Amino acid sequence: MLRLLFPMAISSITRENLLAFRQRATYLHRRLQPGRLVEAAFAGLQDSAPRSAVLALYARVKEVSPSAWKDSRFVQVWGPRGAVYVVPAQDVSVFTLGRFPRNPVLGAAVKAAAEKAKRAFRNRQAHPKRVLSDRAAGVNFRELRIASMTGALRIEWDEATTSWRLVEPPTEAPEPARLELARRFLRSVGPSTPKEFAWWSGGWAGSFGSSTRGELSDALQTFRSLEKELTEVEFEGQRGWALRTDRSRLERAAPVETVRLLPAGDPYLASADRALLVPQPRFRSELWPKSVWPGALLVNGELVGTWRRQLGRVTVRAWRPLEPEVKEAVEEEVSWMPIESTKKEIRWSTRDVPL
């Protein structure tokens, strides 16, 4: 058992402490000053839904523009769970090599996929006047996502199509990147477990698949390698691990008093322990349906509803009656939302909740 590696006394924390810690760690308690985009993106920004990365930045940084995802300090890659991610260019190795499998057979499969991507890229370069699909060029989408673990692929998703190109891979060794990826995971959605880290960082099965045996084995090895940096904590009858440097912040985290519209795939929502974030099964299935995910309404530390955007209209569905000042704060969030629309309006979906 992994916990045998940790002889320190187990710290007990409340759900409120844990949620407040995560919100503060991911800058949801107070917006950063303009321009501090890289700092806000330390755990990567999933960009699977139209411009989710920009809206995640908006929830954390002042004066974010609609084109923030194109900032020269960022690149797009296939990252954790095989999803499209916007990550700091300086941290590409963390989000690519950090997911490179230790198993030699799986590692060989990643390298083989990268070779296929190289051949496909050459095929395209050899026929510049022809539009070749990935399959026609000799590689499929799943192979490209696997090849991205080498760090040699860059992508650009424009909400309609995904283009990709080859670049020189990072020169770093994978092991430091693996450990750093786990640190960022624990800093953003910790305390957690190797099993949850395997799900969060995986990529073989795609965004919605369960972890493979190889991914779980790698996650266990990563936590063992970080033994001296981790501390075991207990919360809600469960045990998990956090960075030792975060222990006091976990125990003392004060409730957050802000209103934010979090996009689908937001770093705060990217944890496997969804029942901790949303205890009610009915609301959990509404926030994470089998179809397209909505965004989440965060009010003073709790997720209290969902929202969807179509052009300039934002439809908010609350799970409980909202105070007038909260509704006013939501409307202000919408008014400053960095979306390219000449008109922004909010629609309240009452359904069976008396607003």
For the regions a language model picked out, list residue spans one by one:
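Loop-centered beta-sheet repeat module
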Residues: 142-223
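Phosphate-backbone binding and catalysis cores of DNA-processing enzymes
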Residues: 2-135, 284
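Cysteine/selenocysteine-centered motifs that mediate thiol-based redox chemistry or coordinate metal-sulfur cofactors
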Residues: 328-355
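Short, leucine-enriched amphipathic alpha-helices that occur as contiguous helical runs
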Residues: 110-118, 175-182, 327
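Non-catalytic regulatory appendages
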Residues: 228-282, 286
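Short, amphipathic alpha-helical interaction segments positioned at domain boundaries
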Residues: 96-107, 170-184, 188, 251-260
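Low-complexity, glycine/alanine/valine/leucine- and proline-rich hydrophobic stretches
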Residues: 259, 266-267, 274-315, 320-323, ...
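A short, conserved structural fragment
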Residues: 73-83, 149-158, 227-234, 305
